[in-house]
Amino acid sequence: MARHCELTGKKANNAFSISHSHRRTKRLQHANLQWKRIWWEEGKRWVKLRLSTKAIKTLEKKGLASMAKEAGINLNQY
């Protein structure tokens, strides 16, 4: 499974690790992803999604149905 948020699409960012001598090597800054079980009111069941912590905070404000509609996700597949 790809390491990205299923609602917002957040994924890893390319960055550099910089040593004391200022040598730079490429690395990835991964999104803070969590498995979250959310109650889907319209479907009357639990839905398990891999979400970024920012998406979890936004869910509390907007709700699951509206965020899934914005992302173009069919919740029946989860």
UniProtKB/Swiss-Prot annotation:
Transmembrane segments: none annotated. One of its GO terms (biological process) is translation. This is Large ribosomal subunit protein bL28. One of its GO terms (cellular component) is ribonucleoprotein complex. Belongs to the bacterial ribosomal protein bL28 family. The keyword Mitochondrion does not apply. InterPro entries: Ribosomal_bL28, Ribosomal_bL28/bL31-like_sf, Ribosomal_bL28_bact-type, Ribosomal_bL28_sf. The keyword Ribosomal protein applies. The lineage of its organism: Bacteria, Bacillati, Cyanobacteriota, Cyanophyceae, Oscillatoriophycideae. Keywords: Ribonucleoprotein, Ribosomal protein. GO terms for molecular function: structural constituent of ribosome. It comes from Gloeothece citriformis (strain PCC 7424). SUPFAM superfamilies: L28p-like.
